Each structure stands twice: as C-alpha cells, then as structure tokens.
C-alpha cells in the first residue's frame, strides 16, 4: 500500500544540483530572505543614539546571530535530527514521544502553537514593508489598501494550489538575493570601515554599555526569525541543498546588512526618516527593487501559509488538533489546502494590518513568539542528542549555550510585549490552550474506553453469521476498534454487533489504526481471527499521511482477494454467479460526553472545552475518509463517573388491617 501521488518535481528536490539549489531558494529562504526589509529600520527606532559604535555593534550582533543561531544550531545540528528525512518541531517530537518523559508533548505543542502564531504576523509585516517602499516614490499612495489587496489575492489563490507559481519561486529568489548582495556591496564601498562589524568585540561592547541593549537585541533577532523554516522544510529539499544554499544566502544577507549600515553612517541626520533598505538602492533601480521586494514578500507569505497547513496536518495525526477538511488542489505530494485555516489566517492577517497600520508598529509584535519556538526546539534537540548517545557533556553544553542565548533573546523581546508583542503571544496562547485541551481530552476518552478479550466472542459472532432468523445487515461490516491492547476489542463495538441490534454479516472487519513515528509509513497487517468470518486489520500510518480508511481498506481487500486469503463474492446466488462482490458498511461508534456524568470539575472543564473545539473539526466518518453513504453512526454515552452507585428498591409494606 503506497501513497498515491508524487510529483516528479518534488522527487528531485533532494538532488544536489543547480535545479535543486534553485528550488531550495524559493521554498526555504523566503522568510529569512525578506528580513533586510525591516531589521535595520527596527534597530534605528530603538531610541539608541546613531553613531559608529552603535551601528557596528548592531551589525556585529546580526552577523553572529546568523552564525550561532542559523548556521550552527539549525544548519549544522538540527538538519541532522531528521525523522526519515522530515524536519520541524513536530517531526522531532514524533521521534521522541516514545521516551519516558510523558510531559515532552508540552514542548512540542508550545513550539508548534507559537510557530503558527508567527505565521500570521509574517505575511503582514513583509508585504506591508515592501509596499511602504512606494512612499519613497509617491508619499500619498494608499499603502494599507494596496497591502490588503495583495494579501487577499495570496490567500484566495490557495484553493487552486500553487504548483505552477511554486516552480518559479526559486527563479525569482535568485535575482532577489543577488540584488541584496550587489547593492549592499556597492554601499559598503562608500564606508569600508563597516567591515569591522565582523569582530564580535563590537557586539560585546554595545551590549555591555548600551542602556537600550535589550531593545536592540529584540530588533536584531528579527534577522533570524526564518531559521525555523530551514528545519521545517527539510523534507522538501534535503539537508545538503539547504546547507549549500545557506552559504550563498548568508553571504548576500550580510552584504546587504553591512551596506545598509554603511549608508546609515553616511546619512545619520536622515536615517530615522527612511528605510535604509530602499535608500541604498540606486534611484534608477528603486521601482524595480520595490517590485522585487513585493515579490519576495509574497514568496515568504506563501511559504508560511503552506507551512501552516503542513504543521496542522501533522498535528492532526499526532492527536494535537481536531480533524479538519483537507484538500489537495494539485498532484504535488505534500501540497495541502485547509479551507478553514486559510480563512482564519486571512482574517488574522487583515486584523494585524488594520490594528498596527504600518510596519514599524508590526515590528513590535514580531519575534516574541518565534523565540519561544526556538527555545522549545533547543530543548527537544537536547533530548534527541541524548537519545542518540551523544556525550552527556556535549549535550549539556549545547543545551546550556542555546538556552542561554535564546533566553536572552526572549527577555529582549519581552520588552516589546506592551508595544505589540502581546498580539502574537495571545494568538500562540489560544492555540496552545486548544492543543493542550485536545491532548488531555483525548487521553481521558481513551482511558475510559472499556476493552474486552476478543476471543471470548468468536463463537457468538460465528453464530450470528449463520443465524438466518436475523435480518442480514451487510455483506461486509467494518468497525474501527479503539481498544489499545492487542487481542482486545472496544466493548461498545461488541454491544453494537450483539446486543443493540444483532447484525448479521458474511464478514466482520475490525480496523486498528496505529500512527507511526515516521512521516510516510503506510503499511498494514491482517490477522484472520475466525476463518471466513472475522478479520483484524492493523494500519500503520505515518504522521504526514491522511487516514483515508475507505481507500486503504479497498487496497487491502484487493490485495487479500488477489492472494486468495478471502472470498468476498456476494452470497446472493444471482450476484455470486456473476462474481459481484458483497457490499460494505461502516459502523462508527461515537461517544458523547455528558458533563453530569462526572463529579471531577477539571475533567468536566476539559471535556466541555473539548466539545467546543471539536466543532471546528469534521465528523468521524469524514475524518477517516469514509463514503458517508456507507456509514452508520451509533452514539453512546461516554461514562467518566466510575463511582459504585446502586439504585435501591423501595419496599412497600402493606398495612395489616
């Protein structure tokens, strides 16, 4: 059983060559590649006096942040912590969830929720900053309406897929990075002493002496916010392509940052009133650079939107998020479209734009959430290194160094909380609460599923099959078995077959679903429990694979029929002689929680919130990819109150006359 579609383009992403490197530029580096649009501007607006020591110190911080955070942590370490080629915080968690640390899921959902929050602010700030460049040509242009129009188009086209434009992202980003590097290099020539910023001494002096060091660090951190994308996109492009491309990208970025710094030192009186990014552009290239910046902002936005869809798809299979309707607008493997999330993101981005109005105010909201994501990734990487047998000393040194660095950045970004950082923290907090409630509620539901030994019921199921006094319910009856222990079955499933309405069928199929720690696993095993009557199928599904049970079961059945392990021809003579297969019917056992069933207030609150959150999801039959015309849903109460209460009979004693 194999995953259905896989684009030839995607297949070649991992090959190291010009095409692979070009595609990597478009997929991976959109976010970090647009940072020069706003980083230097943010530094200048921290309130620190603009002079050579300030600019050299800030540039030194940028260079060494890119080196320590992006190059060493992500390119050299994190990209090696792959899950069968896939990267990202949830893929890393999937590798570690079998560890004894039961609370480790908290790190994953904190990191994922803040990463998703960052995905809402990124399109807003990148597109707004790019369009603001038009003000240098015509100060009266309506920036907000133009920005909203572009954002609307970006989110609208998601429903059609981005296969065609996605192939051109790399072709577009190559000249973008060359533009960054070349214009930066020309500007450096006007102030060669700016190259002293490579010396970390200037960063240390600035942080030691500046009273605004925390504000400067908060602005500097914006240069590496796209580093998490390098890790998340590992599965799309491969480690070697990302590592090689990063060498080129980092060089172009540093040249541009240095060029902006050189321009600032040559134009100190006017530096605060303009964006240095556009100021270093020759007048003849200004309009072209604005168009290029807008295009790069669109690429960055598209990468964040696609990344959000992928993260939530993984979260669904890891039981962190309710199942939602997922569409595949193209045949490209892994390209998803989640309509409700697309709409929610669009509304969120529009609110951010209308709330903050300009990129300078958005900078305050940017960076805080992604700092938390990076800190969670560091902690998970520490567990990963330990699980792989890396020296305890090296593991402690790695975790200690990066926890310290990222805690400093977190502290610096907290200074922006009241100015706008509260926005992404609020969004991330809501997403975390939803994930936490979902995880806890799912554990409660699983805990109170009563399981019984299946072999105790072989005989009665066989008897029901041959009892012609019972109306035939279906030729093939399929149940999803939620019992966790091998050899057991959900008692409500047995109740459905035997007690509620005895269901006679030719074949009974019990489907057990196990979500694997690997991304693309799609396998099954089949056990015949009662010959020609009862079968147990276990499907092993990777965390990036949608559980389309109806499709997979059809493939399994075709495989079993071809190997002559089962005969599914209809038992009706008129159909059997024409080799017509029997029909299938799925029974879904849906447990309904009633708050009064438990005296535990915490569980009541969790389950009530769970019921509210589940409303954004789809029902079980759609979540499992079942043909709804073949599905019967049976609702049963979820009993959590396990207290031993009994009803006493009132004995009435007749009075003797």
PLM-predicted stretches and their roles:
Residues 2-657:
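The structured alpha-helical core of multi-pass membrane proteins
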